[in-house]
Amino acid sequence: MARYRRNGAGRAWLDSLHGLLADRLEQWQLDLDLVPGSMPWSGHGGIVVPVRQEDGSPAALKIAFPHDEAKVERHALARWGGHGAGALLSSDEASCAMLLERLDAGRSLADVPLDDAAVVWGGLVRQLALAPDPRPEWREFAHIAARAEQWSDELPADWDQLGRPFPRWLLEAALEVCQTRGAVGRRSAHDLLVHTDLHFLNVLARPG
């Protein structure tokens, strides 16, 4: 979260976070469910706060910094419908807020032996790969071909700016993949919705 202090937009969002949280708690009739002295969970793009709904059932309130992926995450979760991903209970486009099924933040796929984790991960990849349907929100998802072309432009400069942290051959191999996927993706007629950040720490267990 500290990275948002580096620019004006990020600082403005951090300053507004308390108000955004208070507004969602009121609008969705939620109570904080934090253990005394503990902090909300924070990640690369936002915070997640454990809450209780009006009927006492547990949930998680996620508020993300407004960026392209955060703006369409609610559409992906709605499409998955709680199968292979946490269920979306409610969302607010203006604040990039979502009320989610609460998973067990203390149990991730990173805790599972690698051979077993690979089987679970592969099953999730297949389960979450969905073909488009006529709903208009599909047009809001970024195409991996465009992302690959973007990386082709950005990776060399980033690699140089970061002090060339790995060998040039590895950079060139990554660029080759990006350039190939960009070209192939533009010609493909078989689009699928995929999870683009499915590392083991992002695969959490359901309670119980």
Provide a role label for each language-model segment.
Residues 1-36:
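Juxta-kinase regulatory segment immediately upstream of eukaryotic protein kinase catalytic domains
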Residues 13-25, 133-196, 206-207:
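An alpha-helical support segment within catalytic cores of ATP-dependent transferases
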Residues 18, 44, 55-99, 107-128:
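A conserved alpha-helical element in kinase catalytic cores
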Residues 37-42:
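Protein kinase glycine-rich loop
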Residues 45-51:
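ATP phosphate-binding glycine-rich loop
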Residues 52-59, 206-208:
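Active-site beta-strand-loop-beta-strand hairpin of nuclease catalytic cores
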Residues 201-203:
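Hydrophobic residue at the +6 position relative to the catalytic HRD Asp in the kinase catalytic loop
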